Amino acid sequence: VLPALLTTNGMLIGISTPYRRMGLLHQKYRDHFGQEGDDVLVVQGSSKEFNPSLSDAAVHAQRAADPTAASSEWDAEFRTDIAAFLDDQLIESAVEHGRPLELPPRPGITYKCFVDASGGRGDAYTVAIGHTEGGRFVVDVLRGKHPPLGETSFDPHATTEEFAALAKQYHCYSVTGDNFSAEWCQSAWSKFGVTYNRSELSKSAIYLECLPLFTRGIVRLPDHPRLLRELRLLERRTHRSGKDSVDHGRNGHDDYANAACGVLHALSSSAFDMETFIRAWCDPADLEAWRRSQMMARLSPHGS
């Protein structure tokens, strides 16, 4: 649009309700509001100032119902209770540019798997697999299933079968997931030889637990566009009680972010590496015996 306007000296006018302190709208407000002689004019005003015909009673009722939201919706103030959960620098420093989008399974590595299940409509059904290496938590695989082009749904049973086969390639015979239809998930995954464990933490709590992993620089992510976008758009809200929560914004999604952070939390919660311990403190024969026992457990009928 802007290049075309250069030929006509036309104006580009944008109108919006302010929301979070990020993005193009906030950038224009921050850089140009109240600046004399600027070629960008930013006007800010309440709904009543721009439309005096609005009912005072209706506005007061909305303000009483949700004062925080009303300051944005009716007073045109950027919200102070919502902030970006992760800044761009933290996310960018975690991305391993140049690596394959998916890393193949390797022998001798213990993997964890986390799924964000979906009923096949709206949200994606996602799975993440990762491992610990050199004190860092690596997301090896991140996949999602969406409705096919032109359709509004997909088959969650077929997706579960596909993801269960993927998990087994990484010797993951148990996975962790959120509370979405936990009974259905447990039944569906068990049909394909994988145990589904419901996460003890909520999605928001998982995000908050992962924050120190990002700030310490011990997260390694694939250069996955959907994941990175969802991480950047996660919102951290401070409630009146003082408790923080993290979730996607209005009309947003966080299916890939949920799966990735879920497996990061699973890895950090079980960061004790038995193989490293045996290698450091036991004889080589003990290490080989332990590896054989793990292989036999994976090949047993109970684990297949």
What are these regions (language model features)?
Residues 1-10:
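Short, conserved "post-DEAD/DEAH" coupling segment immediately C-terminal to helicase motif II
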Residues 44-50:
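Conserved AAA+ ATPase "SRH/arginine-finger" region at the nucleotide-binding site
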Residues 210-213:
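Substrate-gating cap/lid alpha-helix
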